[in-house]
Structure formats: structure tokens, C-alpha cells
């Protein structure tokens, strides 16, 4: 791969026919869609300014490049919008309960036979006022309500984004909301979890010790939550004859990951990778000239499986297998080494 020539080609823009923009949200600033649209708008303006015979930067012959924008998410903020935008699904609005059992309006998506659920729609930390946050009281009941609503509509496959939860109840609230129907759901449905969290359920690296303080827990609460999680896992293991509490991702979303893994035999996958696969990203970039990605804050964590890194891996794989010359560029709101 001639990376030097790629750099020159990226700077002069010559011959671009197809550009794909796939950025994550710039958290607290811009959504994925807003970032993508801003970049696309800038490219179009640059293209228009340089359309004279003497200055043809993005033009190939006399045609403007095709610009495709893809909303992206790592399984947390924006996952629902990303799936529905890329796959043209249906948005469903229901009344459900938040983590403090207050009635709210929640949304999930249906794409073909698959429900796209963000647990933060009901169990989200952002829905709870800072002074009200208490993981000893917060429940995942509303997640169960969303799943039951989709199940009654005939959905049997679920993609569940586990980011942004206010809860540490190990999914007990979700299971209670399902009632005895959880057994039918276990038999009939499949679940894929979108999460980059690999922590186990219990212990110093578990859900309570690592994540509960961010949700309002003090040191005493953390110990109590960890004890409660351990006891729940012991009871569940005796019932099923196996234990998933140590599985990677069991500690995600206050133990909701564990409930899905233990009770529904869910498959856990990195959120960004799951989305890229579901939208057919590899096929989209096969004849592209440039892929632009990015996130709000870029540092060493970016190289540990964050969206820009995964997109770069897909681009390099495409180059190696198809011998194409697609270039990849990252834009970040803030960079640290």
C-alpha cells in the first residue's frame, strides 16, 4: 500500500467519484447525523467552488462525487437512529416506565423481523435528574416493557444496545416486567447485545464497582449491589445448571448484560462492529474512493476498538482483498496522544 501517494491523493481530491461519511456522534455537541451532514455540506461547497476548469478538486470528468452518509454508533447513544437511517425501518413509540417507574414515552425500531432496542430509552441515566440517581432503586422494568411490546407484534430477533443505563439491578426488573412470558421469549427469540463493555458481573471489575459510582452509588451501596449481584448469579446458576456471570459483557448496563446472557443465551458483540455488519459496510466501500470517519474525542482508546479504528480495519481489509485504493480519513473534535 502506497500510503504516501494516498496522502497526496487525499489532499488534492482528484478523481473522487464516491465518498462515504460515517462518523460517530461528537458527544455533548453533535449527533452522528449532524456531523455527517456538516462534512457533506463542506465537501459540496468546496466542490462547487473548485468546479472551474482551472480548479477541479473533487470532480471526476464533469461529475460531482456521490456522497453517502451513514449514521454510526458503538451501541450507546444514537444506535436506534443509526439502524433506522441505514436500514429504513419503522419507529415505534410506546408508553413505558423509566428507571424510577415514572411513565414516559419510549421508542424502539423494527427492521424486517428485528427489533432495535436502546435500553437507555427507558433505563437511561440521562432520564434521571442528578439528585434522583440511586442504583439501589433504579429498575430495568421499562426494558422488559419494550421487549414485550415488540414480542407481541411478532418480533423474534432483537438487537439491544446496552449503553447509558441508570440501573444496577442485573436485569431483574426487566425479567419481572416479562412475567412468565420470559420462558416463551427464551425459547422463541434470539438476542444480540451491542456493547463494548467486557466486564464480568461481580467483583472489583464488575458492574457495581466499575459503573455504579457513575450512577450515584456510594461505597456502601457498591458493596451491597455487588453482594446482590453475586447472590442472584448463584440462584440463577443453580436453576439453569450453568453460570454466565464471568462472561465478557455480563457487567454491562448494571448487569443487564448478564440477564440477557444467562436467561436468553444472548450473543454479545462490539457495538460498532455489529452495526457495520448489519448495514453491509464492506459492500458499500468496495467501489468507494474515500471513507471519512471520526468521533468527538480521539486518544489511545480510539485504537482499542472504537468506531474509527474498526472502520479503518474494514477499509484496509477491502484494499487487501480487492486491491482497491480507497483512502480513509479521521476527523476528531479533540485529539490526545
Q: Where on the chain are the PLM-derived regions?
A:
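N-terminal loops that bind phosphate or other acidic moieties
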Residues: 7, 11-54, 60-337
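Acidic, proline/glycine-enriched N-terminal capping motif
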Residues: 3-5
Amino acid at each position: 500500500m502506497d500510503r504516501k501517494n494516498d496522502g497526496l491523493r487525499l489532499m488534492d481530491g482528484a478523481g473522487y467519484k464516491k465518498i462515504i461519511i460515517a462518523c460517530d456522534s461528537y458527544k455533548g455537541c453533535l449527533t452522528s447525523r449532524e456531523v455527517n451532514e456538516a462534512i457533506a455540506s463542506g465537501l459540496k461547497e468546496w466542490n462547487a467552488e473548485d468546479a472551474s476548469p482551472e480548479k477541479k478538486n473533487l470532480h471526476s470528468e464533469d461529475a460531482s462525487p456521490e456522497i453517502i452518509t451513514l449514521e454510526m454508533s458503538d451501541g450507546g447513544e444514537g444506535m436506534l437512529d443509526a439502524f433506522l437511517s441505514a436500514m429504513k425501518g419503522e419507529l415505534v413509540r410506546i408508553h413505558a416506565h423509566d428507571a424510577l417507574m415514572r411513565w414516559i414515552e419510549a421508542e424502539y425500531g423494527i427492521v424486517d423481523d428485528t427489533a432495535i432496542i436502546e435500553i437507555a430509552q427507558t433505563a437511561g441515566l440521562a432520564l434521571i435528574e442528578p439528585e434522583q440517581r440511586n442504583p439501589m432503586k433504579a429498575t430495568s422494568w421499562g426494558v422488559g416493557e419494550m421487549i414485550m411490546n415488540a414480542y407481541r407484534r411478532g418480533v423474534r430477533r432483537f438487537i439491544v444496545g446496552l449503553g447509558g443505563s441508570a440501573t444496577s439491578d442485573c436485569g431483574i426488573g426487566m425479567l419481572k416486567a416479562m412475567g412468565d412470558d420470559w420462558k416463551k421469549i427464551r425459547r422463541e427469540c434470539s438476542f444480540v447485545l451491542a456493547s463494548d463493555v467486557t466486564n464480568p458481573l461481580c467483583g472489583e471489575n464488575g458492574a457495581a464497582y466499575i459503573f455504579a459510582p457513575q450512577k450515584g452509588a456510594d461505597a456502601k451501596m457498591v458493596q451491597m449491589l455487588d453482594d446482590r449481584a453475586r447472590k442472584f448469579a448463584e440462584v440463577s446458576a443453580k436453576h439453569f445448571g450453568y453460570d454466565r456471570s464471568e462472561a465478557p459483557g455480563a457487567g454491562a448496563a448494571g448487569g443487564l448484560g448478564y440477564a440477557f446472557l444467562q436467561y436468553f443465551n444472548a450473543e454479545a458483540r462490539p457495538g460498532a462492529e455489529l452495526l457495520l455488519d448489519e448495514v453491509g459496510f464492506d459492500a458499500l466501500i468496495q467501489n468507494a474512493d474515500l471513507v471519512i470517519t471520526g468521533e468527538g474525542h480521539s486518544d489511545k482508546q480510539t485504537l482499542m476498538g472504537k468506531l474509527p479504528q474498526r472502520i479503518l480495519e474494514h477499509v484496509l481489509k477491502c484494499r487487501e482483498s480487492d486491491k482497491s485504493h480507497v483512502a480513509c480519513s479521521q476527523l476528531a473534535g479533540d485529539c490526545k496522544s
